[in-house]
């Protein structure tokens, strides 16, 4: 009789705190699947690696594994690297591994982000006094990727947060790979005339990049003393994030887990990336 297990595949980080946070998310996912073994592993930079997590599930008798990428958006790691590891393992050990999709643009993820931002607003109001959101600029900082589809999703989420919460304006920056980077983004925002700026890293976990985002925010506060710069907490293990992970697992069993490939540079001739069609 076939036995099913769940595998959460993370990128990995050199930050032990980030690695620990990912493990907590994987642990909390178990509450949604109390009868199913759940394990996790990382693509690089940390242990256990994905193969170790798969070994653990196989040792528990699992021969059918539902694997999901522990990532916000689908770029190279979620589209290429993790599937390569999973397919190689499945072929070697003769088991069935089905792969789900990334967290993506989802109402639950936007709700989680809004909660983090609202907590930052409340903290700013307690620190400096009440201020209208119409007089506040939201800055959403994404990871940044070589995939324009993933980058554009950060902009979409930022706009939905701005319009949904009522901010006067929103700007988007990235920690790497694409532009604008964090420091020039904050310099630009300082010229827009807003007296308060909320900086929200749209990241799942902490790490060097989140630390840098907060560092650039502190530097901007020093450079522009007339503006209130408030840092928001990243997503981490917000209950809505865990719910989204659980939904991605369930999608595999219902056959509704396909990634949106309409704007994937590996599948279609996306403007400026025509030469990368078929590289996946």
Question: Would you name each region that the model predicts?
Answer:
Residues 1-280:
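Active-site-proximal alpha-helix that buttresses catalytic centers in soluble enzyme cores
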